[in-house]
């Protein structure tokens, strides 16, 4: 039966991986990653767990089977004692030079799950600490969460996989906007009181990454799907996505009762990006940034200003943005990040009063 599934790496993700020899071949080396057990306990009612691991030279003189089995079985027993079970444990014992067809990121180990359609691609993930885990996810057609003990630990993974409503006493602040023209076909969904995995696909890779920065730093979740006339250029895709996203944010905010309304973030990152915002209902936009390059990846740098201008007018917000620095990629990214952080302040619910002496926003 197709169901949400987490394909989880072992070394460096579930348990610590020694940086000396990259082998857990004794009980002394066995150490669980921080908060992995509480995280898996929260996730187990929502996902099936499948362990997928490369173990270089397992069963050879360089890594005897019995040396692997002792800490591995001890790890499994710890998990079982806490009510955590794996549907399967799939291990490739080969070294890279063996050129096998089962070593991650190749997918032969998961043949049963693929052939029998046992996992739901829309709600399944690969969790691992290496680039090979990210590539495995791409080969499976699902998303990856690249574990990192500081940047994306198990607590954050749970937060992404189990969206939670932070304003339970209020109706969910959700909006869906569909915008179809001769140039683009767009669907935007926003959940202002949830965090989780953002599903974003516009056909412009750098732009997808920038949109994800808005939601991530804004503390909300969103899905953006856009099919545009990219055979011409990305202008309509970027502009129309901004218009749809601004409209969705405005609709999700409702009457704006209880929100903080104002937000500002002073210089952040190496690029010194600044943002001031007022969800005033009166659109105004001011932008100050200079770019040396015509494009960053597949994204025209001139579309940065146009994106924020478009979103300011459909969001009906006063927006001031500026950045300075040396690297155009970093400057653009800093603007999307600082916009997200400022928006996070503005949409935060503080009470039930309307933040306006006029009685309307």
Curated annotation (Swiss-Prot):
InterPro entries, from UniProt?
HAD-like_sf (IPR036412), HAD-SF_hydro_IIIA (IPR006549), HAD_sf (IPR023214), His_synth_bifunc_HisB (IPR020566), HisB_N (IPR005954), Histidinol-phos (IPR006543), IGPD_sf (IPR038494), ImidazoleglycerolP_deHydtase (IPR000807)
> Per the UniProt record, which EC number(s) apply here?
3.1.3.15, 4.2.1.19
What GO molecular functions are on record for this protein?
A: histidinol-phosphatase activity; imidazoleglycerol-phosphate dehydratase activity; metal ion binding
For Mg(2+), which residues are the binding ones? 9, 11, 129
Q: Which cofactor does it need?
A: Mg(2+); Zn(2+)
Q: Which organism's genome codes for this protein?
A: Actinobacillus pleuropneumoniae serotype 7 (strain AP76)
Question: What catalytic reaction does the record list?
Answer: D-erythro-1-(imidazol-4-yl)glycerol 3-phosphate = 3-(imidazol-4-yl)-2-oxopropyl phosphate + H2O; L-histidinol phosphate + H2O = L-histidinol + phosphate
Q: Which residues form a coiled coil?
A: none
Q: Which protein family is it in?
A: In the N-terminal section; belongs to the histidinol-phosphatase family. In the C-terminal section; belongs to the imidazoleglycerol-phosphate dehydratase family.
Q: Which UniProt keywords apply?
A: Amino-acid biosynthesis, Cytoplasm, Histidine biosynthesis, Hydrolase, Lyase, Magnesium, Metal-binding, Multifunctional enzyme, Zinc
Any single Gene Ontology cellular-component annotation:
cytoplasm
Per its record, how is this protein called by name?
Histidine biosynthesis bifunctional protein HisB
Pathway the protein contributes to: Amino-acid biosynthesis; L-histidine biosynthesis; L-histidine from 5-phospho-alpha-D-ribose 1-diphosphate: step 6/9; Amino-acid biosynthesis; L-histidine biosynthesis; L-histidine from 5-phospho-alpha-D-ribose 1-diphosphate: step 8/9
Please list where the region (Histidinol-phosphatase) is annotated: 1-172
Fetch the NCBIfam families from UniProt.
HAD-SF-IIIA (TIGR01662), hisB_Nterm (TIGR01261), Histidinol-ppas (TIGR01656), PRK00951.2-1 (NF002111), PRK00951.2-4 (NF002114), PRK05446.1 (NF003937)
* Active site per database record: 9, 11
Compartment annotation = Cytoplasm
Where is the region Imidazoleglycerol-phosphate dehydratase?
173-361
Gene3D superfamilies, alphabetized:
HAD superfamily/HAD-like, Imidazole glycerol phosphate dehydratase, domain 1
